[in-house]
Structures are given as structure tokens and as C-alpha cells.
Amino acid sequence: MKTLVLLSALILLAYQVQTDPIQNTDEETNTEEQPGEDDQAVSVSFGGQEGSALHEKLSRDLICLCRNRRCNRGELFYGTCAGPFLRCCRRRR
């Protein structure tokens, strides 16, 4: 089960990397969305003992938020949240 979850996350991540542009021009950077009303934090939980071990490992290394439309710069797509939201994560510094 863990393997299936990790494999599907990697496939979704590869798909997002292919669809996002690699570099932003100065014009695109100026019009980039700022965090605000569209961003909503949603708690995500996994059931069972295996799920909580996976959640614990992810939460140590990543900071994740649920975004309305797309992930911000520096964040990667890690699946979906409740409803139409995208789960976007970045590495903890």
C-alpha cells in the first residue's frame, strides 16, 4: 500500500514538472499571485498505522498547504486535498 501511494505521488509530481514552465520571465514574476484569500490551509490525515507512519515522515521534512489553483514558486504538487484543492509542499529549511 505504501508503495502504491509513493508511486502515485511520484507520477503526479513528474506530470506537474512537465506542465510547469521551468523559468519565469520578469513580467510573469511581477504578475505572480500573492498568498491571500485563495490560499486555504486544510488538515490532511491518513488512516491506519501505516498511514500515520507515512504522514509522520512527510511532516518532518515538508511544509504542506492546500492551494486553490496551483502551487506557488518553490512548492511541489503532492496530491490533492479535500475538494478541488491541490496539496503543495516545500522542504523545511
Swiss-Prot record:
Residues 20-58 form a propeptide. Keywords: Antibiotic, Antimicrobial, Defensin, Disulfide bond, Secreted, Signal. It comes from the Eukaryota. The keyword Nucleotide-binding does not apply. The lineage of its organism: Eukaryota, Metazoa, Chordata, Craniata, Vertebrata. Disulfide bonds join 64-89, 66-81, 71-88. Residues 1-19 form the signal peptide. Belongs to the alpha-defensin family. Its main location: secreted. It comes from Mus musculus. Residues 22-43 are annotated as: Disordered. It is found in: Secreted. Residues 25-40 have a biased composition (Acidic residues). This is Alpha-defensin 21.
